[in-house]
């Protein structure tokens, strides 16, 4: 297949190229001298298996509790008390009534 393609390309370029293409297509690659060395001894390495983690419920895997959640929850307040901060009252505290001497 390569020779046919090379000849078609060579015909398009000219006959001088055809001889060059035929030579390059048919020349085999030079063979290297074969000296076989003894194969290296293969060592098999054992894999270390990790210990299996304790099984957990599916919900426990997904939801992690934070340390903040374990602290004591603040005292609950009414919704209005959360929104409206109390302001200082300008009234003076009432003085206790003088008790008559008995």
UniProtKB/Swiss-Prot annotation:
Residues 22-102 are annotated as: Disordered. Keywords: Periplasm, Signal. InterPro entries: Acid_shock. It comes from Escherichia coli O45:K1 (strain S88 / ExPEC). Residues 1-21 form the signal peptide. Required for growth and/or survival at acidic conditions. Proteolytic processing gives rise to the active protein. Residues 22-58 form a propeptide. It is found in: Periplasm. Its main location: periplasm. Residues 22-41, 91-102 have a biased composition (Low complexity). Belongs to the Asr family. GO terms for cellular component: periplasmic space. Residues 80-90 have a biased composition (Basic residues). This is Acid shock protein.
